[in-house]
């Protein structure tokens, strides 16, 4: 299959998925978002495999919003952006936030994942191994999503604890965005 046909097919598949899940988007906005997600599906799908190994490009698997895929990573980033925006809508600032000592297991796991960023980037660059970046951001996205599902971030009444969690989310978003930038794609503001 020619690359131009693959891109076209992926973009159409992503447009179909975005249109089905987001009826509030105009066709133009849905196509724009689908194009961003489609690019992530192609690049992440390709780069997540070791360069020395063959693989089958499975459109259904690579365009899924679940599992080790570009769309899943983007969905995680968009979820974090949404939480940060809602925090700001409450009249709170994202500036001068400090991480707090981790309390729960999922919070500790997320912090541990973030701490391994520099070592992972050094290794990926030294070995010219973008699949290591993909593996890292998948693990980081999983760690964030577990933390998110176990924690009522915006409903937390302890302001210091909530601000610490928001600082953790902000850092997670920055690391994920740095990684996808290195891989050559970006995240939309909403999906």
Q: Where in the sequence are the language-model features?
A:
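Non-catalytic interaction-recognition regions
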Residues: 1-191
């Amino acid at each position: 299959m020619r690359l131009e046909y693959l891109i076209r097919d992926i973009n159409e598949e992503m447009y179909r998925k975005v249109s089905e899940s987001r009826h509030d988007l105009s066709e133009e906005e849905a196509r724009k978002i689908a194009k961003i997600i489609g690019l992530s599906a192609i690049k992440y799908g390709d780069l997540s495999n070791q360069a020395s190994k063959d693989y089958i490009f499975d459109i259904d698997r690579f365009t899924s919003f679940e599992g080790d895929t570009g769309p899943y990573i983007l969905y995680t980033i968009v979820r974090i952006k949404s939480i940060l925006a809602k925090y700001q809508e409450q009249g709170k600032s994202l500036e001068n936030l400090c991480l707090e000592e981790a309390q729960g297991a999922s919070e500790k796991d997320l912090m541990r994942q973030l701490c391994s960023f520099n070592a992972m980037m050094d290794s990926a660059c030294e070995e010219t191994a973008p699949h290591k970046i993909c593996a890292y951001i998948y693990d980081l996205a999983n760690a964030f999503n577990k933390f998110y599902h176990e924690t009522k971030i915006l409903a937390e009444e302890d302001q210091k604890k909530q601000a610490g969690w928001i600082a953790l989310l902000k850092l997670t978003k920055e690391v994920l965005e740095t990684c996808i930038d290195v891989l050559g794609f970006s995240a939309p503001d909403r999906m």
